[in-house]
């Protein structure tokens, strides 16, 4: 529900607009300010799946924890880590369901293709600075392998 809003200063405001009744479930990939905003709006018994924390992957010093982590206790929320490799055996099932949802228009995605191996470093760095939307692909060759 926050999509592009995690790059702005108005995270809580944006979340409140899109989730006026609070947040029951969060699939967290960003961390940092986005996680702080979510924690400020979690409902009683909220469930949070922690899949990534991209906001701190390139940190050069220890990253402080969420400033309002006490809300997890107050709201009796649950947080569980999720590593996709733990579910690799279910990949065919996931591919089948996701393909069907895509065909039905229930899910969409964005892809940006950047040409040239010489652009790989800058393109990969965009994963961490928030200057992209969707998937980034570096096209290194016109020829098939």
PLM regions and their residue ranges:
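Terminal helix/beta-alpha structural elements that buttress the NAD(P)+-binding lobe
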Residues: 3-145
């Amino acid at each position: 529900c926050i999509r592009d809003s995690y790059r702005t200063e108005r995270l809580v405001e944006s979340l409140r607009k899109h989730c006026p009744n609070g947040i029951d479930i969060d699939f967290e990939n960003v961390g940092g300010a986005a996680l702080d905003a979510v924690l400020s709006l979690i409902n009683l018994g909220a469930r949070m799946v922690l899949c990534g924390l991209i906001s701190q992957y390139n940190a050069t010093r220890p990253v402080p924890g969420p400033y309002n982590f006490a809300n997890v206790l107050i709201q009796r929320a649950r947080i569980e880590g999720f590593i996709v490799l733990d579910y690799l055996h279910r990949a065919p099932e996931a591919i089948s369901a996701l393909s069907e949802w895509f065909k039905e228009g229930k899910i969409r995605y964005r892809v940006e293709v950047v040409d040239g191996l010489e652009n790989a470093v800058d393109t990969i760095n965009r994963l961490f600075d928030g200057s992209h939307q969707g998937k980034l692909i570096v096209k290194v060759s016109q020829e098939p392998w």
